[in-house]
Amino acid sequence: MESPVPMESPAPVTAAAHPRPAGERRRRLTVTGVVQGVGFRPFVHRLATELNLTGFVGNDSGSVFIEVQGPAGALDRFAARLRSDAPPLATVREVVATEIPTVPADPAGGEPTAPAAFHIVDSHTADAAATPVPPDVAICDNCVAELFDPADRRYRHPFITCTDCGPRFTIIKALPYDRPATTMADFPMCDRCAEEYHDPTDRRFHAQPISCPDCGPRLGFRRGDQPVPDTHHIDAAISAAQGALAEGAVVAVKGIGGYHLACRADDEDVVRALRSRKHRGGKPFAVMVRDLDTARRYAEIDDDEAAVLTSRARPIVLVRRRAGAPVAAAVAPGSPWLGLLLPYSPIHHLLFAPVPGSDRPAPEALVMTSANLSDEPICYTERDAAERLGALADAVLDHDRPIHIPCDDSVVRVVDGRELPIRRSRGYAPLPVDIAAATDGTAAPPVLAVGGELKNTFCLTDGGLAYCSAHVGDMGSWETLRAFERAVGQMTRLRQQPVRLAADMHPGYLTREWAERQAGGRPLDLVQHHHAHLVSLLAEHGRLGEPAVGVVFDGTGYGTDGTVWGGEILAVGARSHRFTRVGRLATVPLPGGDAAVRNPCRMALAHLWAAGIDWEPDLAPVAASSEAELRLLRSQLDSDVGCVPCSSMGRLFDAVASLLDVRHRIDYEGQAAIELEVLATDAADAAEHDPDTGLRLPVTGDGVLDPAPLMRALVAALRSGTGRRVTVPALAAAFHRAVADAVAEVVERVAGPVRLVGLTGGVFQNVLLLRACRERLRQRGFTVLTHRTVPPNDGGLALGQAVVSVLTAADPRTDTVEEG
């Protein structure tokens, strides 16, 4: 789309006039990508001025438009540097240049389209908002330096920001990105801020969230319903919050994307109290530490993990806790891992620094968890705070800059130098994934994919880009459904309304029910769960349309045959929206449905039953079950009443965790498998040389992985004695190796000429298994894809659904269910 030429131009924003020699040329450039809210127009202004070019730059809803005039060589250098020198937060996707007639110089400045200097023009609004919205990013080093510089006028200003840092996604209401279209519209700039805003030599030139102590926003502290006297002064508010935290209070802290609940990380009683208030169970809390040096004292952090911790995204990074780290056991019960993050907002930096003139020490580590009950959405509005924080927090460190779109913290692991996303949210969302390969150069319909039931995100496509939402959460409550609907409305208002929808084919998913209600006359594509996982992986790597084999291991997914899948080997060809199930884990009964998911001992008993192993009392899952429970399960399994056939690898991990007496009941999803991985990781080096465990996961001729021999071998090993070679950790490690061996064997058997393999699904958050499978497959000559952009768990599901729907729209003769 050609960008509009403005009908009138504002006064130039300070640049010297240049005479126009003969031989000049003029070009119109349209720049797309992440180019709004990142200081791109000021950058273009500085670049054009440096090269002695004239013209203008502006935003419309879909792009940055530029008209620039000067010598051809300078224009070429200008176009090249648009990419090479772009601002840190910008991502230039495409630059389209068109030669247009030159405009003669007008020394009097009377020609509105050709002033004698390069300048920024007003933004223009189009019907559809195609430009990507930038994510929120951490405060930059320059702003941190000013925050603690007594000579700077923004000294200790909790909302300091510039064009290179700060909130974007959470404050944008509409595009183009200008201050009136953000939540900063309520804070008129003071004269000094306005001067900086209009000065092209200033770092805050056209920085929309610009503010200072004179023009707000304001920070305050309160206990209960009453503000504490004098705490509307920044230092008094910070000092009061530090004091409350030191005394053992839980303090709600309003951040960029919502409220956190903060407390001392070293106080067992306080952490337990917070866990009780949130109804958290045993799921670990994240810990925010003062700086990287502090983080290194708490955990073993390599250079790659340090780079992610200090990146602009500032995610929570899962790292190995150091022995003796001053962290309460209740922070991450039974886990050697800590989820650490560094301060990313000015308020965080102030909270971790001593207040001038105060003798109160600043904290060095705080539990920092979303302000919500478990399984509810994060608290982020003033109304939310009034209604929900009273039961969760003793005090609130608050401010009056509204949050328009909530956004939880992101969570990652670092595997061999690369990020493995666990939760993609703040710092990453809503950056788009390029799915141009799915559109094949044609106009693709905008699709809304509603994701899954757990770890929900949704995805909206716009042309060749797929926009994945921030983390929404588990769709088990009315509050989360409302948050989902609100987030969908915000995204579609920023972009465009979908003409097609996609959902998981599970008939009981709330997301599917919602999509069916909302579809009206629009097509709704029901996408098989594991197929969506595989396509999301191919999409993020730009490998759509290539033949591939997907190893898709997770806990639960509705199969095309109505059974529970989760141990799948799928093949796709040139049509990625079609798949063939070429292998799987053998089915066992899932007794009691969700009850078996919450109680790994039930899955262990089901696998023992399927393997023909008697439930003797020396077996841990038998000992962990009551007589009544055993009778019920025996009746269900023998009669096949209340049982669904299940081929889930996640449930096999649960069963083995229970059989090895690791975990029989869970407080949160994946707990048993996570603890099994920890046990196996600690033993992996020693167990690697142990030839005597005899654990194998055999693969039949038709690509079925049979767990029965493995279960029999585990029981035999457990009963053979307690010598070093049959320790439980060694068996846990041997089980991981057996699964990896089976994966390599089945893929080699079914792949034929295909050399591309993807590892996806929530089970591949298990780094020990991920590495083992990847190593074995590479040894056999396969190219192996793993997730780097969206999570392998259900948080990445919506991207795959969206792509399948886009492809189905282009190939209406087919559907998304399996072939053959």
What are these regions (language model features)?
Residues M1-P209, P213, P217-G220:
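Intrinsically disordered, low-complexity, mixed-charge
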Residues H530-F553, Y558-G559, P600-W609, R737, ...:
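Glycine-rich phosphate-binding/hydrolytic loop that grips phosphoryl groups
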Residues R543-A610, P617, D638, C646-S647, ...:
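Active-site histidine-anchored catalytic micro-motif
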Residues V250-A265, A365-P377, D554-V564, D640-R663, ...:
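Conserved phosphate/anionic-ligand binding catalytic regions in large, soluble enzymes, centered on
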Residues P209, G216-P217, L454-R482, R486, ...:
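A contiguous, well-structured pocket-lining segment that forms one wall/lid of small-molecule binding clefts
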Residues K254-G258, A503-H506, G555, M649, ...:
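Glycine-rich beta-strand-to-loop/alpha-helix junction loops that act as flexible
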Residues D504, G521-H533, L756-T760, V767, ...:
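Conserved phosphate-binding/catalytic loops in two-lobed NTP-binding clefts
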Residues F118-A502, H506-Q518:
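Active-site-adjacent structural elements in enzyme catalytic cores
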